[in-house]
């Protein structure tokens, strides 16, 4: 997954602006594909970014779930962010892109995210490792997988 990085950023704070960098990203995508590497672009769940990712020729998009996670405690904002993710995932799927999602996902907010269709992969790391300090890695992973099991895509 290609992600933007800002100076002194501890974690990715937003998605790539694919629409503004189509040519450069298309060249990078082509080189990676020629080396046998499938490409995912980390984007905000906005339709112009989804369309740009398809134009670039990316095989995947990873939808940035940070705003969903950030607003999880506010039902109205959570619903709005979940709607953006659902709309973006549907459009990406229509355009032939495979859909991943990640950023800020945890044991509390993951069940609500499973309303998003067409998800192939979820990128979850910090919360599993944090939980593993208390319960061990095997149990932390089992607990997360149990939350994912009901997903029918």
Show where each model-derived region lies:
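Glycine/small-residue-rich loop that forms an oxyanion/phosphate-binding "nest" at active or ligand-binding sites
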Residues: 1-24
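Glycine-rich phosphate-binding active-site loops on the catalytic face of alpha/beta enzymes
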Residues: 2-9, 60-73, 118-137
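Histidine/lysine/aspartate-rich catalytic loop segments that bind and position anionic ligands
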Residues: 7, 38-91, 95
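A general structural detector for well-ordered alpha-helical segments in enzyme core domains, enriched
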Residues: 21-28, 49-52, 81-88, 109-113, ...
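Surface-exposed amphipathic alpha-helices with a cationic face
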Residues: 26-36, 54, 86-94, 145-152
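Glycine- and other small-residue-rich loops at beta-strand/loop junctions that grip anionic moieties
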Residues: 42, 81, 102-103, 133
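Catalytic cores of alpha/beta
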Residues: 46-56, 101, 105-119
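C-terminal helical cap(s) of enzyme catalytic domains, especially alpha/beta-barrels
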Residues: 73-78, 131-153
């Amino acid at each position: 997954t290609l992600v933007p990085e800002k100076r002194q950023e501890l974690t990715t704070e937003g998605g790539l602006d694919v629409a503004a960098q189509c040519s450069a990203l298309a060249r990078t995508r082509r080189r990676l594909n020629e080396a046998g590497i499938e490409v995912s672009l980390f984007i905000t769940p906005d339709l112009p970014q989804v369309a740009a990712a398809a134009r670039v020729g990316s095989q995947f998009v990873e939808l940035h779930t940070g705003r969903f996670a950030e607003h999880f405690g506010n039902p109205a904002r959570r619903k709005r962010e979940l709607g953006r993710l659902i709309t973006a995932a549907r459009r990406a799927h229509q355009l032939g892109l495979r859909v991943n999602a990640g950023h800020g996902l945890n044991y509390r907010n993951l069940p609500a995210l499973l309303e998003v269709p067409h998800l192939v992969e979820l990128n979850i790391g910090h919360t599993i490792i944090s939980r593993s300090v208390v319960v061990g890695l095997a149990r932390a992973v089992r607990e997360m997988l149990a939350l994912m099991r009901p997903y029918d895509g």
